Amino acid sequence: MQNQNASLTGLQMLQDEMGRQHKDALSSFHLAEPIAVEIAASLKNTGRLMLLGMGASHWVNRIVEPAYRAAGIDATAQVISEYLRAPIAGKPMTQILTSQSGGSGEIIRYLDDTPDHTHFFGLTLDSNSPLAQRLPSLIGAGGVEKAFAATRSILISLALHAAVLEKLGLPQDQLLAALSNPVECDDAEAVELLAKSKCIIFSGRNLLQGVADAGSLCLMELGRIPTLSLEGGQFRHGPFEVLKPGIGVILLAPVEDESDSVKRLASECVAAGMRPVLFDLRGGEAPEGCVTISLPNRPGMGGAAEAVVAMQAALVKAAALMVPEVGTPLRSSKVTNGE
């Protein structure tokens, strides 16, 4: 496998990861049950969850943070490098440390600096990693992610969290349906538009804001352009002043009632002379002037999974038009130590 990966381009490695992510995520969900039961029991005991990670792992945590709150858990997602410097004191809490490689420098330092690992759990794609060896861990199926930017690892991580959420009483039928029935979107117009942008703003609501955050990181890594991710309300409170030709806008509209506010935001972007790309889970009438990508009508984690897959497909295609040798990093590595 190592020799095979060495012969693949960065783009081919990304495509390989995305091509098997639904199957691996579905397997991950079903294989996670024993540890998911343990984590759910811990959460019922503490009532408090700290989600810690770096890079795309942190943005996965941001996606699922509202879902845990909906399950009655006091959940917070924090960048672990920040948490190392300003930990939250107080009552006991369950902690899930996420690292697709299981070897992130910040994760290792945190485990070294924190002697008591009661109510600590890991989430990783590598069963032989330091994280998996030191903590009871949710393990993703299919092995570690080889491509530079996170694609498959995001969907697998969502599936692993979904296994825990189901044990907390939140049914995951919609997520399982999304994983069992992959959908290909007609994104050609959106890809062409995004590939011409010099900077792109991402925005969503609720779980889809974490999806927007993950997309923003993905395009910085692959397209090598500046991006900014702002929750819908934050985007409207001042940053609208940056809108001008050359800036792209990506909006994500959920099934839930928040969809109306996202579509109003899309209309306001059009009025400002923009042509936003709208990933729409709700359906109905799309705002005029948008490039709309219609997705299956799924709420909650199912909707997040649909949005993740559709957005990453469009972003990888756009990035391939922006830079040569897309997916081959110039200044970064897959496993990083910022400490």
What role is predicted for each listed range?
Residues G10-R48, S137-I250, E258-S259, L321-E339:
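Active-site phosphate/pyrophosphate-binding segments
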